[in-house]
């Protein structure tokens, strides 16, 4: 179980390998990845609870062709996801980078589910 430090703890020296700023979904995912590599990790969050932009979106994570979607027989594809993103930004985004993000979010979601037992549901 990780230790939770309050502001009073910062009067002491803390020796860590990795500092993650922000305790939202991205920050916590970064912390898990660093921990998986055997690093000691400190997550610094300014709020009194973990939050971030994913919390503002009700915890929704857009992705396509994830294991969770396949298990729930959700018909979606990376091509549909790509078309949705490009239509939303009126084809202004760099298509290469959009495709890379789509590939990486699918891998990240599957990694969180398989390696860290994250339960995902379809809304």
Give residue spans per PLM region:
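Residues that mark the start of a beta-strand
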Residues: 17, 38-40
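Aromatic pocket-lining residues of Rossmann-like dinucleotide-binding sites
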Residues: 34
């Amino acid at each position: 179980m990780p230790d939770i430090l309050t502001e009073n703890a910062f009067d002491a020296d803390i020796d860590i390998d990795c500092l993650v700023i922000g305790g939202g979904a991205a920050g916590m995912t970064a912390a898990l990845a660093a921990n998986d590599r055997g690093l000691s990790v400190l997550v610094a969050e300014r709020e009194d609870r973990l939050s971030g932009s994913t919390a503002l979106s009700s915890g929704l994570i857009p992705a396509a062709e994830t294991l969770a979607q396949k298990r729930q027989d959700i018909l979606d594809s990376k091509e549909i996801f790509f078309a949705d993103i490009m239509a939303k930004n009126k084809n202004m985004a760099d298509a290469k980078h959009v495709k890379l993000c789509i590939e990486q979010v699918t891998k990240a979601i599957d990694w969180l589910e398989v390696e860290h037992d994250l339960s995902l549901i379809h809304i």
